[in-house]
Amino acid sequence: MILNEDIRAREVRLIGVDGQQVGVVSKNEALRKAADADLDLVLLSPNAKPPVARIMDYGKFRFEQQKKAKENRKNQKVMAVKEIRLSPTIEGNDFDTKLKHVRKFLTKGAKVRVSIRFRGRAITHKELGKQVLEKMADEASDLSNVVTKPKMEGRSMFLMLAPLSEKDKKKK
């Protein structure tokens, strides 16, 4: 932000301490008014014709901006991504155990990446892996949405599940 003597414009549209528009005044007059109030002259929009400046306590303004930014960072929700690895030939009980883990992660609000690693000649039976992933998505459909459908990446096939949003929960 540009403030006080660093302002290059000869005239500025001045906004007073109380937020009321004073009008278009010379830079020197605006600086004098700011000095009389023992505050700073801050250039808000330098590209406007004439540029808009406001009389305010810049230190307090910067503190408020930092506080808002910190609050926004705190309110951001970081999505954890958990990974569950399966084999293309997984059987009943093992599948159920992995499904239980997927459900637990989804209820805690984490995204889940379900992956299948094809070893050796198993890569020739990609359809088996796809069936297992589709079955997993189907079984967890009451708690999740499919973000990415089963797709190959090197020797692995994966599927991404995200927990249902509040809107989606109401639909189901």
From Swiss-Prot:
Pfam families: IF3_C (PF00707), IF3_N (PF05198). SUPFAM superfamilies: Translation initiation factor IF3, C-terminal domain, Translation initiation factor IF3, N-terminal domain. One of its GO terms (biological process) is ribosome disassembly. It is found in: Cytoplasm. Its main location: cytoplasm. Keywords: Cytoplasm, Initiation factor, Protein biosynthesis. It comes from the Bacteria. Monomer. IF-3 binds to the 30S ribosomal subunit and shifts the equilibrium between 70S ribosomes and their 50S and 30S subunits in favor of the free subunits, thus enhancing the availability of 30S subunits on which protein synthesis initiation begins. Belongs to the IF-3 family. This is Translation initiation factor IF-3. It comes from Lactobacillus johnsonii (strain CNCM I-12250 / La1 / NCC 533).
